[in-house]
Amino acid sequence: MSTKQKKTIQKGSFKRLLKLFFFKNKMLTALMLFSIIISAVATALGPQYLGYATDSIVQDMSNPVSSNIHWDRFFFWAWISSVIFLIQFVSKWLSAWFSTRIISDTAKELRSQVETKLWSLPLNYFDTNSHGDIMSRTTNDIDNVVTTLNSSGADTIYSIFQLVGMIVMMTAINWRLALITVIIIPVSGWIVTLISRFVRKEYQKQWYYTGMINSNVEESVNGHNIVKLYGQEEKFVEAFRKQNRLLYESSFKAMAVSNLIQPLSRFFTNLNYVIVALGGALRVISGQMTVGDVQAFIQYTRQFQTPFSKLSQAYSSLQSGIASLDRIYELLDSEDQAEEKPEARASYRLQGKIDFRDVSFSYVPERKLIEHMNLVVEPGQMVAIVGGTGAGKTTLVNLIERFYEVNIGEIIFDDKVEIHDLTRACLRENIAMVLQDTWVYKGTIGDNLKYGLKREITEEEFRNACRETFVDQFVSTLPDGYQTVISNEMSSLSAGEKQLLTICRAFLVKPNILILDEATSSVDTRTEAMIDQALDKLREGRTSFVIAHRLSTIRNADVILVMENGHIVEQGSHKELLAQNGAYAGLYQAQFES
């Protein structure tokens, strides 16, 4: 990505955040801005009225005729100043409250947008992006944006108004001294901008490497058994060290250089303070200013450091926030899955016949995975798909579920319904899957079994399904039975028991189309037999596609498809394909001999 494109993204991201921040709740925003303006005006007026109080004392003390001090005038100006500072306190607190509410709403909206976006992304987004990086964008980056808004939100706006108010008041007191102060600001700001450009690049690297570390940790946690089995701990540790070192370097550079900004701003502010103190003293001697004016001006100069430093600090913090914001909007701007046809049916019961007509598909244009495939599957048929890695087995079933869209050709159901004539939700209500990688969510076994059900079922129907799929056999031995809490990360269930759960889940859905990824290699013989029986019951009367890894399990398939490089090279029953003595016979013989 070019530098120009990056700048465009950064500006666009920041504008979108401002729009979200200011216009999500216009009433709260208006109240916040009103409170900030009142607070800034009160802050600007306070020193001036204290100067009036000082002048009243100095004038009385220097009066050659009478040395009486008019305390009533002094206390009047002091009382006015106190009221102003009280107003400043209340309005500042209100602005902070409104700001916190707006930031919370903004964070909530950002998280909602990201969550909604994740469900609208096509499957290839998750196939081509690391899951750790996606998690980092949805958690770490949003948290960082919220932190940036908290540190650079209302305070930044307040500091701007405060600076403007102080400049106006200083100009009213003495425009020459005010000009010196105003000249120093752009010089300091220009230097801060130069530093911040470097800081932003390092913050972008920092959040990128944070995503990489998350991916590394996710892989090591999910596959820790395999890593230990093959003695690859050192490899993971070394990869983590490398990424951690890169994260350290980018973070250190960003923070080290960023830490220059505030001291540098203070240096220019203190330099301005010295010039004002000397210039003011000379003007008091010459009678051009009163002592109260100098006191007020010096107080403005000293207070000038606070908003100026806050603005400098906010600008530095903003670089980290914008870097995270770019990553969030990069996710939000990713291309969605293809839109549904306006007339697509939201409810339809498929009978199970599927007709692939001249279907072609590729993830990338230069590499075709499926080319001009023609296939007719009758209702209730069991179709087994065999072939080597990359042959197109999984791609074929992904096309049936519309996880991917065909590039060319059509998929027709029941001789009359084209796949795009149904909404994705409607299509998938007719399909159930039993995958090689079983998945359960945190909840009770009962809730997991009913996951995805769109209809009410009776307790008797539920228990019958559990008995038919042998789930009741092991759940009944658990102390809490179907109320036992399980999760994907922590569970007392074996791999085979989890597979039986997913089979029962599919059984309860009562689909007319099944997709089965053969997954019995990691279980014992007894459990494998139960899984096979449960699958046989599940397949009864349903069209099923079985991604087969062991050819001995698909002898009874109605149709066996042998795929190579996206093409169906052989098609027929087990006996027919063996008789042809082709690719299938070679695969079968190889497995039999092994």
Residues covered by each model-derived region:
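Membrane-integrated ABC transporters
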Residues: 1-46, 58-80, 95-99, 103, ...
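Short intracellular "coupling" helices and adjacent cytoplasmic loop segments at the cytosolic face
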Residues: 2-7, 104, 112-136, 140-142, ...
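An intracellular "coupling" helix at the cytosolic face of ABC transporter transmembrane type-1 domains
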Residues: 19, 23-26, 123-124, 140-149, ...
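Transmembrane helices of ABC transporter permease
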Residues: 24, 28-41, 84-87, 151-206, ...
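Alpha-helical segments in transporter systems
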Residues: 27-52, 77, 81, 96-100, ...
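Hydrophobic/aromatic residues in alpha-helical transmembrane segments
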Residues: 46, 50, 95, 99, ...
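Helix-loop-helix
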Residues: 60-61, 169-183, 253-326, 332
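ABC-type nucleotide-binding domain
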Residues: 347-594
